[in-house]
């Protein structure tokens, strides 16, 4: 169970406290639990949506989005903001991009990106709420966190000595493949036919974003992994809103 608690502590704002620093091997194994953390988030969103039945759809969607952000402590939104600033401000240069990514300040590109992503997610949630498709909310958090596992499985980590390097080096790769397959089957089981098009769209976005990372950076960082998670969650909820 330790890898799950490590993953939950890292990916969420839930009050999880570990005694001491985990071993690198356990850190690597915690990646296997990322889709499970996503499933937990999705079930909490589904429960919240059920409890909010009867509330006006815009308020319902806004409260769901607020809970969604609070569950992760806006961790991945921070990565998205840093990546947006760095990608445009880096002008195609690897070292400049990495340097900007480490700057804690957010520029106008980061702000605009966050506003657009949250606005689109809010609108998609509004559509799903109005159509009574709250159960499909489980899918996006699972896909986003499974994508992080897939990214670390098949993409070099470019910041030596960082937490991400320990995760990537000690990830049980064969087991990770089975976890990804199980995550895919779970999403198809939960979403049925409604999940096929959004899942295919998410796969396409994953491959495109990974290609951009490899072309610019030669791999991934924690910030770009967080950005990918946010963009894939958005892709799934938009796909579901358009497909249902």
Swiss-Prot record:
UniProt keywords (A-Z) are:
Cell inner membrane, Cell membrane, Cobalamin biosynthesis, Magnesium, Membrane, Transferase, Transmembrane, Transmembrane helix
Reactions that this protein is recorded to catalyse? alpha-ribazole + adenosylcob(III)inamide-GDP = adenosylcob(III)alamin + GMP + H(+); alpha-ribazole 5'-phosphate + adenosylcob(III)inamide-GDP = adenosylcob(III)alamin 5'-phosphate + GMP + H(+)
A GO cellular component term found in this entry reads: plasma membrane
Which BP terms from GO are recorded? cobalamin biosynthetic process
What molecular function terms (GO) are annotated for this protein?
adenosylcobinamide-GDP ribazoletransferase activity; cobalamin 5'-phosphate synthase activity
Q: Which Pfam families match?
A: CobS
Its biological function? Answer: Joins adenosylcobinamide-GDP and alpha-ribazole to generate adenosylcobalamin (Ado-cobalamin). Also synthesizes adenosylcobalamin 5'-phosphate from adenosylcobinamide-GDP and alpha-ribazole 5'-phosphate.
HAMAP family according to UniProt: CobS
NCBIfam families per record: cobS (TIGR00317), PRK00235.1-5 (NF001278)
Q: What is this protein called?
A: Adenosylcobinamide-GDP ribazoletransferase
**Which gene holds the coding sequence for this protein?**
cobS
């Amino acid at each position: 169970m330790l890898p799950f608690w490590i993953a939950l502590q890292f990916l969420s704002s839930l009050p999880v406290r570990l005694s001491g620093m985990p071993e690198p091997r356990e850190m690597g194994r915690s990646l296997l639990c990322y889709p499970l953390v996503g499933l937990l988030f999705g079930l909490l969103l589904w429960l919240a949506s059920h409890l909010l039945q009867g509330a006006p759809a815009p308020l319902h969607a806004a409260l769901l989005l607020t809970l969604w952000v609070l569950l992760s402590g806006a961790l991945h939104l921070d990565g998205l903001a840093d990546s947006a600033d760095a990608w445009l401000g880096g002008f195609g240069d690897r070292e400049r991009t990495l340097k900007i990514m480490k700057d804690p300040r957010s520029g106008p590109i980061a702000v605009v990106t966050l506003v657009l992503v949250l606005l689109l997610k809010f609108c998609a949630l509004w559509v799903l709420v109005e159509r009574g498709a709250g159960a499909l909310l489980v899918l996006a958090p699972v896909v986003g966190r499974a994508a992080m596992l897939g990214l670390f499985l098949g993409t070099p980590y470019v910041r030596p000595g960082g937490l991400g390097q320990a995760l990537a080096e000690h990830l049980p790769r064969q087991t990770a493949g089975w976890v990804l397959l199980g995550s895919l089957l779970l999403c198809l089981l939960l979403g049925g036919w409604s999940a096929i098009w959004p899942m295919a769209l998410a796969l396409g976005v994953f491959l495109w974003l990974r290609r951009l990372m490899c072309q610019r950076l030669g791999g991934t960082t924690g910030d770009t992994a967080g950005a990918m998670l946010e963009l894939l969650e958005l892709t799934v909820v938009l796909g579901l809103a358009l497909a249902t």
